[in-house]
């Protein structure tokens, strides 16, 4: 089931790329600022699917397991070298650098797309987006070209049998969690004028 979700995520991203002018003009550079859910989204299959469609990509993932928007903001304020920076080049090979900061990675490429996401535990709690997302967006925007498009990654709900401690936030109910995530992401995207949502949780 998880593998199916990963493929769906990649296809959603791929459709966005294929519909843009970049698809035939240049290498598309995509950066995810996230956690293990962004690892699933961009480190598996996306390069291969894009390559099959004739789309050249450079894919970056700033990884900290379970990282929340609040923690990303703290890392930004402190310019903390807290991330594992995983980068898949046009050759499809993945390389990793440890102890990287947001500022350093944002400057590493001329990014076309940057995705942001909340940690799964808080992904259906709008107040957590409201508290941290605007500051993170402001930090990112001033360090990116004007052409860069921001995306919000809508993650999926836990399995109905999950024992994750964060599941209690949703009464341990998968449908409740899904609806909360969909509502929170929609509201956060509108409030922060993010036009692209990757609906991997649907």
PLM regions with names:
Residues 28, 40-129:
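Conserved SGNH/GDSL esterase-like catalytic core that processes O-acyl groups on lipids
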Residues 8-18:
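Bacterial N-terminal signal peptides
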Residues 19-23:
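Sec/Tat signal peptide C-region and signal peptidase I cleavage site
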Residues 1-8:
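Bacterial N-terminal signal peptides that target proteins for export
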Residues 34-38:
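Short polar catalytic/cofactor-binding loops
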Residues 98-202:
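Alpha-helical cap/lid subdomain in secreted, periplasmic
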Residues 31-33, 153:
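Short hydrophobic segments within beta-strands
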Residues 25, 52-54, 145, 191:
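Short, well-ordered coil/turn elements that cap or connect secondary structure elements
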């Amino acid at each position: 089931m998880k593998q199916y979700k990963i493929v769906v995520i990649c296809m959603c991203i791929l459709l966005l790329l294929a519909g843009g002018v970049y698809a035939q003009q240049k290498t598309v550079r995509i950066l995810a600022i996230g956690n293990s859910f962004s690892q699933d989204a961009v480190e598996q299959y996306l390069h291969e699917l894009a390559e099959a469609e004739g789309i050249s990509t450079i894919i970056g993932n700033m990884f900290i397991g379970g990282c929340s928007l609040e923690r990303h903001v703290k890392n930004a304020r402190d310019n903390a070298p807290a991330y594992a920076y995983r980068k898949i080049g046009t050759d499809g090979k993945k390389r990793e650098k440890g102890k990287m900061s947001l500022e350093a990675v944002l400057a590493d490429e001329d990014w076309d797309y940057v995705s942001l996401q909340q940690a799964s535990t808080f992904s259906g709690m709008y107040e957590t987006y409201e508290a941290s997302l605007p500051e993170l967006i402001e930090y990112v925007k001033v360090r990116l070209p004007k052409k860069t498009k921001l995306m919000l990654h809508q993650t999926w709900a836990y399995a109905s049998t999950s024992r994750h401690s964060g599941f209690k936030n949703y009464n341990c109910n998968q449908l409740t969690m899904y609806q909360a995530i969909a509502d929170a992401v929609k509201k956060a995207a509108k409030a922060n004028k993010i036009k692209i949502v990757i609906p991997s949780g649907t």
